[in-house]
């Protein structure tokens, strides 16, 4: 540390927006939604708007205020699982 004159991190990095660790939210959350057809409709709209993007669904427990499920609902046709 003394050779640099300040606190130095050689291999440290902060995750950035475009490095694949963050997801952009589609519209506002569906608070109180109990209709699966509404969720599927939103997935279809998102897929139509962004055909080359992954679509992830995250479900929350509104009583405990925790995430209870998360899964990829759509993979773009260009994605190859190697």
From Swiss-Prot:
Entries under SUPFAM superfamilies matching the protein: RuBisCO, small subunit
UniProt cross-references to InterPro entries, sorted A to Z: RuBisCO_ssu (IPR024681), RuBisCO_ssu_dom (IPR000894), RuBisCO_ssu_sf (IPR036385)
GO cellular component terms, semicolon-separated: chloroplast
SMART domains according to UniProt: RuBisCO_small
Chain segments annotated as transmembrane: none
Subcellular localization, as worded in the UniProt entry: Plastid, Chloroplast
A Pfam family matched in the record: RuBisCO_small
Keywords: Calvin cycle, Carbon dioxide fixation, Chloroplast, Photorespiration, Photosynthesis, Plastid
Biological-process GO terms, alphabetical: photorespiration; reductive pentose-phosphate cycle
Biological function: RuBisCO catalyzes two reactions: the carboxylation of D-ribulose 1,5-bisphosphate, the primary event in carbon dioxide fixation, as well as the oxidative fragmentation of the pentose substrate. Both reactions occur simultaneously and in competition at the same active site. Although the small subunit is not catalytic it is essential for maximal activity.
Remaining remarks: The basic functional RuBisCO is composed of a large chain homodimer in a 'head-to-tail' conformation. In form I RuBisCO this homodimer is arranged in a barrel-like tetramer with the small subunits forming a tetrameric 'cap' on each end of the 'barrel'.
SUBUNIT field: Heterohexadecamer of 8 large and 8 small subunits.
Alphabetized PANTHER family for the sequence: RIBULOSE BISPHOSPHATE CARBOXYLASE SMALL CHAIN 1, CHLOROPLASTIC, RIBULOSE BISPHOSPHATE CARBOXYLASE SMALL SUBUNIT 1A, CHLOROPLASTIC-RELATED
Family: Belongs to the RuBisCO small chain family.
Name this protein carries in UniProt: Ribulose bisphosphate carboxylase small subunit, chloroplastic
